[in-house]
């Protein structure tokens, strides 16, 4: 049987603008801009700013009461799960759905300027899963974190196949920075210097719509 729980995050988070709330907000903003708290000696400060201790205690209590066997999270939630893992009864798995660079090198996205936190908390998970051998290599090379590779399975098979002679590329995506639209367009421009008969069709919507169509 499959049971779906809809959890109201407001039950766990205090959003009132208290001095502590303002301090945590300031820490996150300063770190995102300058990386000043991205040091091992400041891990407790940055961790509390991202995921306050009182909030963590509420989540540990709730998750343990559910008697889960395994808890799986993705993206930035994997770091939070790592903070909870030592106090949870369940096995814990973090699973990233983008490349290493997409999580760590894109400004203000996912793990931007949080390398020291990752080094402390991701190893506390029972497993941390990445999508490719390149990601596994980079986590080990840059952060000395061991990961496990599981390639996303193909979710569907299409009976209709493209005609390679049509000279058209098709990209379907959200128009957001993290999807690498700028890299795609730069790559296509370089490609066209060698063969200008090809066409690139982009389907989607998002925050970068005006920049893409300009």
Regions found by a protein language model. Name each.
Residues 91, 100-101, 117-158:
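Donor nucleotide-sugar binding/catalytic pocket of nucleotide-sugar-dependent glycosyltransferases
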Residues 57-64, 96, 109-128:
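Membrane-proximal helix-turn-helix segments that form the acceptor-binding/catalytic region
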Residues 156-168, 192-194:
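Nucleotide-sugar donor-binding and catalytic loop/hinge architecture
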Residues 73-78, 96:
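Short His-centered aromatic/hydrophobic patch
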Residues 131, 150-153, 169-174, 178, ...:
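Short hydrophobic "strand-cap" motifs at the C-terminus of beta-strands
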Residues 167, 171-190, 207-210:
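A conserved mid-protein helix/loop that constitutes part of the nucleotide-sugar donor-binding site
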Residues 2, 137-138, 201-214:
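Short, structured helix-loop element that forms part of the nucleotide-activated donor/catalytic region
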Residues 2-42:
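Conserved nucleotide-sugar phosphate-binding/catalytic loop shared by glycosyltransferases and other
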